[in-house]
Design a protein with these regions (language model features):
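A general structural motif at alpha-helix termini
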Residues: 45, 116-119, 128, 142, ...
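N-terminal secretory signal peptides
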Residues: 1-36, 47-54
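Extracytoplasmic/secreted proteins, especially bacterial periplasmic and envelope-associated proteins
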Residues: 91, 95-102, 110-114, 118-126, ...
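Short, low-complexity, disordered segments immediately C-terminal to signal peptides
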Residues: 61-76
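Active-site substrate-binding loop specific to GH73 endo-beta-N-acetylglucosaminidase modules
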Residues: 42, 46-50, 204-421, 557
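N-terminal accessory alpha/beta regions
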Residues: 109-210, 215-217
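Flexible, low-complexity segments enriched for small/polar residues
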Residues: 78-92, 97-109, 341, 345, ...
Length: 559
C-alpha cells in the first residue's frame, strides 16, 4: 500500500468516527479576519522554504536548484503577457490569461488558444451554455468511478460508503482536470458549497451522487428557484439537516434545522430580516417533507405529519402568506418567493462576486447591484447574474486578487504538467485525491457544517497549509509517480531541449503560468541556488525540479 493510500485510509477512519458523533449543525462555524496581504503570505519563507520543500518530498529526486533564466521565446510556446494585443480580438494577452486563470481550473496552452480565438466574451458565453459543449471524452474517464454516476438504489444494492466517497471525490477532480466545461465546474463547486451536504455524514453518502447530478449540476446556470426547490426535496439534504424526521402532528414540535439554514445560508441571509418566529413558521410549513426510506427512497410528503402551524391563522414569512395553500404546494410557493426575494438576489450576487472578483467587493457595490438586477430581471436565472459579473470592469481589474483553494490548486498542477488520463491508474488517482486534499483541508464535498468551505484566502494560507502546497507541487512535478507517457517533460519545456537552466526555467514558466516569472520569485530561487542562468541543462530529471519550483511560486497560487 502506498503512502497516499495509507493517508486515505486514515482519512476514511476519521470520517467514519465523525458520522455518528456530530450533527452537522453542532459544530461552530469558521470565522476569520479577511485582512490579509496575499502576496506576502504566499511568498512565505522565500528561498529557504523552496529548498526545504524539495528536500521534504521523497517521491521526487532532490532538485538541482535553477536560477534566473535567459530570456527566450520558443515558437512552440504560448504567447506571453508582453505579446501585443491580438489583431482579431483587440484584447491583451494579460486579460486572456486572467480569464483563463479565474474561470478555469488552470490555464493550458490549448485553453489560452481557445479563448483568444473566440474572444473573452464569446468564450464566457460558450462556457455558460455548457450543455452545448461536447465533453463526451469525460464519459470514459467517469466510467472508472461508477458510483459517482449511480442512484442511491444502485449504491445501496452493493453498499460501500468508503468507495462511494472516494469515487465522488475522484470524479469531481477528474472533471476539473480534463473536462471542457470549466466554468460550469467552477459553478458546480460554488453551488455545492452554497447548498452544502457533507458526504461523510453517514446517512447522506449514498444520496450525494444524485444530489450532485440532479440538483447542483443540473441547475448550476439555471433558475435558482428551481435549484432551491430541488435541494429542499433532495434526500441528501433532507437527511443531512434532519428534515426527513420532522413532524408536527400530535402536538410534536417540528425540527428547525433545515428551516434555519435555508433562511440563513441558502436564501436571504442572517441579515435578511427574518426572526425566530419566521424560523418556526417555516419549520411547521415543511413538516412532513421527507423520503420514502433511508436507503434508496426519493422525496415523499407525509400529510399525516404535516401541520401549517401559525401560518394557518394569519402568520407570514417575510411577507409571504399561504393564501389557502397547504402541504407541498405551500412549501414550494414559499421557496420560490424566497428565491425571488431582493435580499436573496443581493446575497447570491455578493457571494458570486467574492468568488469570481475578490474579497474586496462589498454587498453595496455597483457590480453586486447590477448582478442582482440581472438575476431578478430573469426570474432567478443564474447565468445572466454570472455574466454580469464576468463582463464587468471590476472583474477585468481583479487580476491577481484571488487565491486558488486546494481543489483548484491540485487540479491546476495536473493541468499544468499536462497529465494524460490512464484508466489503469484510476484507483491511484482516487487515493491521491483523497490523501492530498485531506492534507490541504479541502476534500470535495466533505465540509462538515452547512455553510460550505470558506471562501476567504486567509483560511487557506496558514503556515502548515503553505508547506503542504509546496510539498504538493513537488509531488505534482513528478505527476504523483505517474509513468511516461502520462507525464512528458518535453510537452512542458518544448523542443528542441533547453540549452541552459535559465532557458528551462523560462520555458516552464511560460508553459505553466502563461507569463514570465516575477522578479521576486526568481530572486527566491536564486538565493537557494549556487548555479547561474548559463549553467548547462543536463538531464530530464532536472525538468521535474524546475517544474516544481515554478509550481511553488506565488504566481501559481493565484487564480
Amino acid at each position: 500500500m502506498t503512502d497516499c493510500q495509507h493517508q486515505a485510509e486514515a482519512y476514511e477512519a476519521h470520517s467514519s468516527r465523525r458520522d455518528d458523533a456530530e450533527s452537522p449543525t453542532s459544530t461552530k462555524r469558521v470565522a476569520a479576519s479577511r485582512r490579509f496581504d496575499r502576496r506576502t503570505a504566499l511568498f512565505g519563507a522565500g528561498a529557504a522554504a523552496l529548498a526545504a520543500t524539495a528536500a521534504a518530498c521523497t517521491t521526487a529526486s532532490a532538485p538541482e536548484t535553477p536560477v534566473r533564466p535567459v530570456p527566450v521565446a520558443p515558437t512552440t510556446l504560448p504567447a506571453t503577457a508582453a505579446t501585443p494585443p491580438s489583431s482579431e480580438s483587440g484584447e491583451t494577452q494579460a486579460h486572456i490569461l486572467h480569464v483563463a486563470r479565474r474561470l478555469s481550473f488552470g490555464p493550458t496552452p490549448q485553453l489560452l488558444d481557445a479563448i483568444q480565438a473566440a474572444g473573452t466574451t464569446s468564450w464566457i458565453d460558450q462556457q455558460l451554455a455548457w450543455e452545448s459543449i461536447d465533453d463526451s471524452a469525460m464519459d470514459g474517464i467517469l466510467a472508472s468511478y461508477p458510483r459517482a454516476l449511480m442512484t442511491a438504489t444502485e449504491i445501496s444494492a452493493n453498499l460501500d460508503q468508503k468507495r462511494t466517497r472516494q469515487e465522488m471525490a475522484a470524479a469531481t477532480v477528474a472533471r476539473a482536470i480534463w473536462g471542457k466545461r470549466q466554468l460550469h465546474e467552477l459553478l458546480v463547486d460554488f453551488w455545492s458549497n452554497h447548498l452544502n451536504v457533507n458526504i461523510n455524514h453517514d446517512a447522506t453518502t449514498r444520496h450525494k451522487p444524485t444530489d450532485d447530478r440532479d440538483v447542483i449540476r443540473r441547475y448550476a446556470t439555471g433558475r435558482f428557484a428551481d435549484m432551491l426547490v430541488a435541494s429542499a426535496k433532495s434526500p441528501a439534504m433532507l437527511l443531512y439537516l434532519d428534515q426527513a424526521l420532522s413532524r408536527a402532528d400530535g402536538g410534536r414540535l417540528p425540527i428547525e434545522n433545515y428551516a434555519r439554514e435555508m433562511l440563513e445560508l441558502h436564501t436571504v441571509g442572517i441579515d435578511g430580516g427574518y426572526d425566530e418566529a419566521d424560523v418556526k413558521e417555516v419549520a411547521y410549513l415543511l413538516s412532513g417533507w421527507g423520503i420514502a426510506n433511508r436507503n434508496d427512497g426519493g422525496f415523499q410528503f407525509r400529510p399525516q405529519w404535516h401541520n401549517m402551524g401559525p401560518l394557518a391563522t394569519g402568520g407570514d414569512v417575510l411577507g409571504w402568506r399561504p393564501n389557502g395553500l397547504t402541504g407541498v404546494a405551500a412549501g414550494e410557493s414559499l421557496l420560490v418567493y424566497l428565491a425571488r426575494h431582493e435580499k436573496t438576489a443581493t446575497r447570491l450576487a455578493y457571494k458570486l462576486a467574492v468568488r469570481f472578483i475578490g474579497e474586496h467587493v462589498q454587498p453595496t457595490d455597483g457590480v453586486v447591484s447590477s448582478a442582482a438586477q440581472a438575476y431578478t430581471a430573469n426570474d432567478t436565472a443564474i447565468a445572466p447574474m454570472v455574466r454580469s459579473l464576468l463582463l464587468s470592469p471590476e472583474f477585468r481589474a481583479s487580476s491577481g486578487r484571488k487565491m486558488r483553494r486546494p481543489i483548484e490548486y491540485f487540479a491546476s498542477i495536473l493541468r499544468s504538467v499536462q497529465l494524460q488520463w490512464d484508466p489503469a491508474r484510476a484507483t491511484n488517482l482516487s487515493s491521491t485525491v483523497l490523501s492530498q486534499l485531506s492534507l490541504l483541508g479541502q476534500v470535495p464535498l466533505a465540509w462538515e457544517t452547512p455553510d460550505g468551505y470558506p471562501d476567504f484566502d486567509a483560511h487557506w494560507t496558514t503556515a502548515g497549509a503553505m508547506v503542504a502546497r509546496w510539498n504538493l507541487a513537488t509531488l505534482g512535478s513528478n505527476s504523483f509517480g505517474a509513468p511516461s507517457p502520462q507525464f512528458d517533460a518535453n510537452r512542458i519545456l518544448g523542443t528542441p531541449a533547453p540549452a541552459t537552466v535559465g532557458d528551462a526555467i523560462d520555458r516552464a514558466a511560460i508553459a505553466i503560468l502563461g507569463e514570465p516569472l516575477e522578479a521576486s520569485s526568481r530572486a527566491a530561487i536564486l538565493s537557494a541556488s549556487g548555479q547561474t542562468s548559463t549553467t548547462p541543462w543536463k538531464t530530464t530529471s532536472n525538468a521535474r525540479a524546475v517544474i516544481a519550483y515554478v509550481l511553488q511560486t506565488p504566481q501559481n497560487q493565484i487564480r
